[in-house]
Amino acid sequence: MKIERPRGTRDFLPDEMERRREIEKRMRKIAESFGYREVATPTFEYLELFTRKSGEGIIEEMYVFKDKSGRDLALRPELTAPVMRMFVNECSVMPKPLRFYYFANCFRYERPQKGRYREFWQFGVELIGSESYLADAEVIILADKILKDVGVNFSLEIGHVGIMRHLLKPIGEDRASKVMRLIDKGDREGLESYLAEIRVNEDLRDKIFSLLELKGDESVIEEAKEIIDYDFGHLESLSALLRDVGVDFTLNLGIARGLDYYTGVVFECYAEGLGAQKQVCGGGSYELSSLFGGPVTPSTGFAIGFDRVCEACSVEAGEKSVVAVVSFKGLESQAFRVASMLRERGFTAVVDVMGRNLKKQMSFASEMGVKYAVILGPDEVKSGRVAIKNLETQEQVVVAEEELFSILQ
């Protein structure tokens, strides 16, 4: 009986892997051009790292297990917490800000559907040590540039969780956190019900829903000032800078985060054509270091859903020029020697390892889409020459071995 792959996982064949590597390469190059350096953390961590950040409820969505000593471990469901754990363990005394990026697989036990898998990849950055609007601007500009460079058609929405949190102060932290979770889920009915349950007065209720409706250009800040007495300077400065550098965005004061460690600016990117799973990037400012035993350290960052970007973007893998070195029986060592020379010059060269005759070697090369075949026969080997055949045009020339490289360029 065949063994199938686990539900919610995928196999990637060479064509798809080459495309994914091209997209990944572009993301890495852009992040590095902003001064970000790659970090990596373990595939599994102590379970407490994620429950301390997100609460016990997240366990239902995680792959959790005990090691042989009975310690509770989990496959990482995301990468911000591991990177911040690494910061507290290894980097907290380094000069700030720190600019890190990562690319890795994550695991969540969710119902598989289009755009949502149990094993998935994230590309993300963390800018650690600044609470300035300039830090928020940098990571938003970086996310915007990455998505544009790989050809995703998307919209960018920016909010600020501090505004709603300030409005909710009268109901206390625990109740405010539940309200934020309901807003984050988009559960308006549940929100209405909960506000009634905790007897929020009509004035505060109206202000909450009025704030949630504010979406548009910078004029929404002026409207928000009519609803709440709050210092909007950070958001105003950020908006002005982003406009100055040509980033297109919409302010959406209805964006929330259900997790208390988000502190200020938040943003989301939505791609066209992905249906319900259209969010391809999410980020914002947060403070996690102190939760993990480190110093209070303001940070900001984002994570890109790499699989969704692959589905939404227009990048194709670059064509590789593959050369097949084919030979008559008894000339295998010469074929391996010529192939090695080609590889040293930067070509991709393949030789027959099946013991096929010349005709079958040529047929296989054509089936594989190879453009050129370098043919070694007894006469060519004796005279230090090779035959080069263009398998697309069927043209063939015989040249001195040293001329081979210039013809294949």
UniProtKB/Swiss-Prot annotation:
Taxonomic placement:
Archaea, Methanobacteriati, Methanobacteriota, Archaeoglobi, Archaeoglobales
Identify the PANTHER family for this entry. Answer: HISTIDINE--TRNA LIGASE, MITOCHONDRIAL-RELATED, HISTIDYL-TRNA SYNTHETASE
* GO annotation, cellular component aspect: cytoplasm
The UniProt similarity line reads:
Belongs to the class-II aminoacyl-tRNA synthetase family.
Q: Which organism is it from?
A: Archaeoglobus fulgidus (strain ATCC 49558 / DSM 4304 / JCM 9628 / NBRC 100126 / VC-16)
Q: What biological processes does GO assign it?
A: histidyl-tRNA aminoacylation; L-histidine biosynthetic process
Keyword terms, alphabetized: Aminoacyl-tRNA synthetase, ATP-binding, Cytoplasm, Ligase, Nucleotide-binding, Protein biosynthesis
Instruction: List the InterPro entries hit by this protein, alphabetically.
Output: aa-tRNA-synth_II (IPR006195), aa-tRNA-synth_II/BPL/LPL (IPR045864), Anticodon-bd (IPR004154), Anticodon-bd_dom_sf (IPR036621), His-tRNA-ligase (IPR015807), HisRS-like_core (IPR041715), HisRS/HisZ (IPR004516), HisRS_anticodon (IPR033656)
Subcellular location(s) per record: Cytoplasm
PROSITE patterns xrefs = AA_TRNA_LIGASE_II (PS50862)
Report the GO molecular function annotations.
Answer: ATP binding; histidine-tRNA ligase activity
**Gene symbol?**
hisS
Q: What is its EC number?
A: 6.1.1.21
Q: What is this protein called?
A: Histidine--tRNA ligase
Q: Which reaction does it catalyse?
A: tRNA(His) + L-histidine + ATP = L-histidyl-tRNA(His) + AMP + diphosphate + H(+)
HAMAP family recorded for this chain?
Answer: His_tRNA_synth, HisZ
